[in-house]
Amino acid sequence: MRKIVCLATSPWYPIPTRKQQVMSRIPDAEILYFDPSVTYLAPLKDKAARPGLSNYKKEGVHPQENITVYSLPPVLPFFYKFRWINKLNQRRMARFVRRKMREHGFTDVLLWVYSPVTADLVDLVPHKGLVYDCVDRHSAYGGLMDPTLVDRMELELAGK
């Protein structure tokens, strides 16, 4: 059975998006689906984000027999603005993903990513294939980001 590690930009629950639809329609693969991180500042802005600070410590959930969903650990904010922060965050996430891969006996995986920030992660997670499923223009979201940096990470990721 094929092994897929999916680093998503939207959580599996509560509202299914295209990412969940794609993964749920691959029946001949075992999938580790990782919900996105929250930043350490997120709960200050939105109290509903507070559980995101510790969700990564929970056991994985199984929305389907072949899919296990985990939450990624929280990250430092401003990763869309400062590359050095993104690199720190991605190293932390890569360690977490590698640990879950070991726990599930995952080798020779297809790494499936949705965010340009993973440009700093993909070389840290062993994989035999890479899919960058570009569904949004991330640099157009606005907010606390450097659009030039986000576009540069996206180009780097697309070239891997």
Residue ranges and their predicted role:
Residues 25-27, 123-126, 157-159:
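Short, conserved loop/helix-junction motifs that constitute active-site signature segments
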Residues 3, 108-110, 129:
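Structural motif
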Residues 43-44, 139-148:
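Short, charged, surface-exposed secondary-structure boundary motifs
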Residues 1-55:
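N-terminal subdomain of nucleotide-sugar transferases
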Residues 93-94, 110-126:
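An aromatic- and histidine-rich active-site surface loop
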Residues 41-106:
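A conserved catalytic-core segment of Leloir-type glycosyltransferases
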Residues 95-102, 146-160:
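Membrane-proximal helix-turn-helix segments that form the acceptor-binding/catalytic region
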Residues 30-32, 112, 123-140:
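Active-site proximal beta-strand in glycosyltransferases
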